[in-house]
Amino acid sequence: MNLKLHNRDEVFLVKLDSALYFKAEDHYTCVYYGRDTKQLLPFGLAHIEDALELCDADYMRFGRSHIINLQKVVHVSATKEMVTLLTSDNTFLPIHIARTAIREIMAHLKDERPCEEGNIAGGGNF
């Protein structure tokens, strides 16, 4: 699925299936596809958030500076204030997130259905 954004002179297509997260950069937004792959968009994060809501994509805004692809989250650490995402080349990308946003992410993920095929809720003994 593509997110189509446009201004007067340009059209931008964001590949939502492979995007990991969006990060606010002043009045712009960077979309990250991997460790060294990013695209600068001339739109604020609020504009991106509104556009994503229309797409019904599995993205959620956390804090003032991040919108994260929830399908790519593999680990959240409140202690380290880190979210680890799985890239399309099956490598892990840790990103630093503000403590309040980490709590939002953890609360959201805990509220989701506890078990999906192959997952065990609650951890512990296997």
Regions found by a protein language model. Give the residues of each.
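Basic, polyanion-interacting recognition surfaces, primarily
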Residues: 1-126
